[in-house]
């Protein structure tokens, strides 16, 4: 990944890219471990991470942190509120690279409007929102979309239930679209895990039926999933250029409602820009949440771009 930023600096002449290349090269050069006295296993104790959005190492660490945070938040929400859960995927059509940044901005505003509608606002208790971007290399287009985990009131599944057609209509309205977008909504029952890949495949099939293109992201994602092959090519440079620009200074995840309150109560810190060394407060075996989706961060260990 570093060589692509170096190539962008040579091509465009912006020192900004050279600085990112330097950060990537020095990322996690030194790792210090301590042995857990309880388990005897080694645990990362000290390290310097570059925190560049497209860095696969930082994305992996960020993924673990977000996954663990969400595990704690979901468990606490269940304990305090005994709420139900739904999983929502909101999509739009693919866009060319130069439209990616403004499209994401429009989606952020559309998402804000969606959760201000009375029908939605009175039915949900909050949300965890994650932005994902996949790329279709054959069409040279990008597909930004949202995955949303939503705690709902117990009576939501009765008279307050919002059907998929209504979610679709509301998202279309919020985004002011002149076409009908693909929206996937499903209930999370009991302790059943959310299989993000299965959901992605369902969405892909639905979009293919409408002759739209969605390339599905997979586990795990490496820097080679952002760029094709090991060589610096014009296509790879454009991919890094557009992704870096679209994601710069942008929050990829967001909490609202009771999930935001619980995040604050648990004093979990910032998973996107905070410490990437200390993932857990206790040196116990990491209980990876079944909600595999929450491995976020562009390129989170599941996401974002796939060749």
From Swiss-Prot:
Task: State the Gene Ontology terms under molecular function.
Answer: DNA binding
What single Pfam family name could you report for this chain, choosing any that match? Rep_1
The residues listed in the UniProt record as binding DNA, with positions renumbered to this chain, are 219
Keyword Magnesium among record annotations: no
Arranged from A to Z, the UniProt key words for this protein are:
DNA replication, Plasmid
Presence of the UniProt keyword Secreted in the record: no
- Which GO biological process annotations does it have? DNA replication
Query: Record's family?
Result: Belongs to the Gram-positive plasmids replication protein type 1 family.
The protein's name: Protein rep
Q: Specify the species.
A: Bacillus sp
């Amino acid at each position: 990944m570093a060589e692509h930023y170096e190539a962008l600096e040579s091509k465009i002449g912006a020192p900004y890219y050279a600085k990112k290349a330097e950060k990537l090269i020095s990322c996690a050069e030194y790792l210090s471990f301590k042995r857990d006295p309880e388990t005897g296993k080694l645990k990362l104790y000290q390290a310097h991470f570059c925190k560049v959005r497209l860095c696969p190492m930082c994305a992996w660490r960020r993924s673990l942190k977000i996954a663990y945070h969400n595990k704690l938040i979901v468990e606490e929400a269940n304990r305090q509120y005994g709420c139900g859960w739904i999983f929502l995927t909101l999509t739009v059509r693919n866009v060319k690279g130069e439209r990616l940044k403004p499209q994401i901005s429009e989606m952020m505003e559309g998402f804000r409007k969606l959760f201000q509608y009375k029908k939605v606002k009175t039915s949900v208790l909050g949300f965890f929102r994650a932005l994902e971007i996949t790329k279709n290399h054959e069409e040279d287009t990008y597909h930004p979309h949202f995955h949303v985990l939503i705690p709902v009131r117990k009576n939501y599944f009765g008279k307050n239930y919002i059907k998929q057609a209504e979610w679709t209509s509301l998202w279309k309205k919020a985004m002011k679209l002149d076409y009908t977008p693909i929206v996937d909504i499903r209930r999370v029952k009991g302790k059943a895990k959310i299989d993000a890949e299965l959901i992605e495949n369902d969405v892909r099939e639905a979009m293919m039926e409408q002759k739209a293109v969605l390339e599905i992201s997979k586990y795990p994602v490496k820097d080679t999933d952002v760029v094709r092959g090991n060589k610096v090519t014009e296509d790879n440079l454009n991919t890094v250029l557009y992704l870096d620009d679209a994601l710069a200074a942008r929050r990829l995840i967001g909490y609202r409602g009771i999930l935001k309150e619980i995040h604050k109560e648990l004093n979990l810190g910032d998973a996107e820009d905070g410490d990437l060394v200390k993932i857990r407060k206790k040196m116990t075996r990491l209980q990876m949440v079944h909600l595999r989706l929450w491995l976020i961060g562009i390129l989170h260990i599941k996401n974002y771009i796939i060749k």
